[in-house]
Amino acid sequence: LPYTDLRDWIKQLDKAGELIRIREAVSPYLEMSEIADRTAKLQKGTSKAGGPALLFENVTGHPGARVLMNQFGSERRMKLALDLDKPTDSLDAIADRIRVLIHPETPTSMLDKLKLLPKLAEVGSFFPKLISSRDAACKQVIHRSVEEGGKGIDLLKLPVLTTWPQDGGPFITLPCVVTRDPKTSKRNVGMYRMQVYDGQTTGMHWQRQKVAAEHLRDRLRMATTQSLGAPSIAASSRWVGDTTARVDIMAQTSGGTLPATNPTSIPTTTLTKVREGRMEVAVAIGTDPATTFSAIVPAPPEVEEYLIAGFLRGKPVELVKCETVDLEVPAHAEYILEGFVNLGELRTEGPFGDHTGFYTMEDQYPVFHITCITHRREPIYAATVVGKPPMEDAWMGKAVERIFLPLMQLTLPEIVDVCLPPEAVFHNLMIVAIRKSYAGHARKIMNGIWAMGQAMFTKCVIVVDEDCNVQDLAEVTLRVANNIDPERDIQFTLGPVDSLDHASRLPNFGSKMGIDATRKWPAEGFTRPWPPMLQQAPTVTAKIDALWKKLAIE
């Protein structure tokens, strides 16, 4: 059955023997993260890797608070979260389900159309459902800011974790951040860390290539156009992770294009009006597992995350209107933070101990001003800790990998399988198996990946033949070591890189490497015969299979 909320999920984890309740006093300052880190690395490399989920019930400095961690931290829990608990289930089943959602077969006859109706009806039943505030558990307790007519809010009452010694402060690490496209009014749900500055404000780690950052840039363009009083004015922001942290405005007139200007050359009144503009934001913390997971899924722009969550859990997500902003949030979340980001306002964010295993250093990011906090009675705070792999996000990343496969195959159908090794923190290495059909096919795949959404950040791409199991890193290593001539088969290019990449020559820009480890063809300039790989005779394999147990070797 689908999990209605985080509490249903916790009950299931408890019932399945996947939860440990910690009643010893533990501090959210470094101590919880150390326990979660050690737990995530238990039985590393085995089928039982990841340890149990952790429910802290005695949080130092926060009487009555509870904190859930490592909820996605094992293969079994990741499958449970996505309703895949049969012994024969694997995360590959997620890819099959996603294909139905994003790419139903085109009907070619009336009979095919009739067969498609039940599938369309099923997908239609997963769209989010708006319910009234009185039925929304997240509205059980409401705190409004003084500006909103309330008695005030205090984010510091939440047991937000500081996870590593050099972190810039406590960070909210498992939020579902809701924004709205100012051009289309479509909602987006993403996951971005939030540094807590004080009781009313946080940072918003909106890297420039993320959807929420694009929403803010669009909102900034609109505000700038209105401020300058000319409908032909277009504004572009070079902000989000850019250490210059400036707004460049390009004025277009009938006489041509004016050069970009520094903010200091823009009239003060104009910049003031831009900064006074706002973009509304809402944050849900502690949702059901499918909703939390949907916030990190690389969804096509036309597919809303709430729909994906409903599809994954087999039941629509119930939403409720916010109190102070025009956004809809999961009705049964543990906490809801409502507020706004001021256009043009930036503040230092970081450092932060990141999933790369290194600190992400300080930079300038938008500031989230909270106008209202609503929560359930006796709320449960959900958090994660990232660091040197393997961590909880390794299993979340593996599920994303399985969802990413059918999305890639829409554009590159010759892809057979893909692997994003957690040791390479996902965006640093992608291994791809393809059905090779022509000379240079592997290079076409590399360039296609670097042109595809969030895959553009991939630092290294390895392409192998379809008979290579990309999930077996030993086999991949064998193919790479034996199948390449380094000068011939390694390709370098320049392009955007992840903001977390501390090794790139410039922030957000650097080099990438592609390795063609496929068999080489005469059309690719290989003139010698390509040797066959070793393989035992099938008759011998079958005979020894039947004899193996009797030999008692293992």
Question: What are these model-derived regions, one by one?
Answer:
Residues 222-269, 273:
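Intrinsic disorder/low-complexity segments
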Residues 1-224, 262, 266-554:
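Extended, highly charged
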